């Protein structure tokens, strides 16, 4: 069994249940950083409905194309896909109700840059969710050596200008960190942030 296989993944990870933990709801905007083929982005689009929006960012153009193809077959017109590196891609400023990382924060070459961009994209009242592998032996998954434990991931998130709300275990092999923007660390104060699009929420939703 491969943890990259979307179909087998459904046997050990429930996207809808995990999204439910974040408070994401109808009319909300979610940015899925490292979206792959849309394992979380497509369920989120169903939840968001026609008044919401989901943007998936991934460096793998083929995966983004498959996500958009599946969205089209379902009639999900509220899904957008962007091919790009998380370190270099910012789709808006202060537009997102939810910035989502689905078992991938450990994969980025520079997670500090990625989280810096997340801080700029999230709304003042929005949420960042980091779902990732526990740093322990599991039947499959990425090498333990590249995984972040909960404390390391939480420290990176705090350093990017967030306040940790809670850390939860997600059986069988994961943890989930929910964080909110720290008003004492406003966006734009972090040197690791890269330039990108600078759309307001209203412009983004047009």
Describe each PLM feature range.
Residues 9-29:
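Conserved alpha-helix/loop element of class I SAM-dependent methyltransferases that forms part
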Residues 97-110:
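A short SAM/SAH-binding and catalytic strip from SAM-dependent methyltransferases
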Residues 87-98:
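A short acidic, Gly/Pro-enriched loop at the edge of an enzyme's catalytic core
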Residues 125-132:
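Conserved beta-strand signature within the Rossmann-like core of class I S-adenosyl-L-methionine
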Residues 112-124:
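A short glycine-rich, Lys/Arg-flanked "PGG" loop and its adjoining helix->strand segment in the class I
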Residues 146-160:
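Short alpha-helix
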């Amino acid at each position: 069994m491969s943890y990259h296989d979307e179909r087998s993944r459904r046997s050990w990870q429930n996207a809808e249940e995990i999204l439910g933990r974040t408070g994401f709801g109808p009319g909300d905007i979610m940015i899925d950083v490292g979206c792959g083929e849309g394992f979380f982005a497509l369920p989120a689009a169903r939840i968001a409905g026609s008044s919401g929006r989901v943007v998936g960012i991934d460096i793998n153009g083929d995966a983004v194309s498959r996500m958009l193809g599946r969205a089209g077959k379902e009639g999900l017109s509220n899904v957008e896909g962007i091919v790009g590196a998380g370190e270099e891609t910012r789709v808006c400023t202060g537009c997102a109700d939810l910035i989502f990382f689905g078992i991938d924060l450990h994969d980025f070459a520079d997670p500090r840059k990625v989280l810096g961009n997340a801080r700029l994209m999230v709304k003042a009242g929005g949420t960042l969710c980091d779902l990732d592998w526990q740093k322990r032996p599991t039947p499959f998954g990425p090498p333990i050596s590249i995984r972040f434990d909960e404390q390391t991931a939480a420290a990176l998130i705090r350093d990017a200008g967030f306040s940790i709300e809670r850390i939860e275990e997600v059986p069988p092999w994961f943890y989930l960190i929910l964080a909110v923007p720290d008003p004492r660390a406003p966006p734009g104060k972090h040197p690791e942030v890269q330039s990108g699009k600078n759309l307001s929420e209203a412009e983004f939703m047009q």
